[in-house]
A protein has these predicted regions:
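Residue-level signal for functionally critical sites in structured catalytic/ligand-binding pockets
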Residues: 2-4, 61-63, 115
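Intrinsic disorder/low-structure terminal segments
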Residues: 6-7, 11-16, 53, 81, ...
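A generic structural micro-environment signature
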Residues: 7, 39-43, 59, 67, ...
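Alpha-helix boundary/interfacial micro-motifs
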Residues: 13-15, 72-74, 107, 114-115, ...
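Primarily secretory-pathway and cell-envelope proteins
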Residues: 19-82, 124, 129-143
């Protein structure tokens, strides 16, 4: 009986150690790439927002000009549909431990903004041995 208890105690110890170790296997932590809107409160008369993307990782990242917007409605995020839209071709690079400010146009001719909470969504690529795509979001308020 003592051997069985010892076996299970050791088994749980090693399993918990392996699970804790696996959490640290990710090369880039979830908060190593951060985006924010500056300033985060704007008037509805604004034509664009400025996003500041911070690359706190150990790898260079890149992103295109494409972005999405969502509005917070009825306690959930709802996509804003701009319909068919062409995007300027281009790639922005952000070196490790650096940041970059980009403009995101609100495209008011395609959507009528009302005061409320919004967020911008961009996709970045982390340029490590195997490229990793990551979604980053930043909230802002239109008054």
């Amino acid at each position: 009986m003592v051997k069985v208890q010892l076996f299970f105690s050791l088994l749980f110890f090693f399993l918990s150690f392996n699970i804790k170790g696996q959490k640290n296997l990710q090369c880039v932590s979830n908060d190593s790439i951060v985006m924010r809107v500056v300033p985060c409160v704007l008037g509805t008369s604004s034509d664009f927002i400025c996003v500041d993307i911070f690359n706190n990782s150990d790898f260079r990242i890149s992103c295109g000009t494409y972005y999405d917007f969502q509005q917070f409605q009825f306690n959930k995020w709802v996509d804003i549909d701009f319909g068919d839209m062409a995007w300027e071709a281009g790639i922005y690079y952000i070196n490790r431990k650096r940041n970059r400010v980009l403009k995101c146009y609100l495209n008011k001719e395609k959507y009528k903004y009302t005061p409320g909470k919004y967020r911008v969504i961009k996709y970045v690529t982390i340029e490590k041995e195997i490229y990793e795509k990551r979604k980053v979001v930043a909230d802002f308020i239109l008054k």
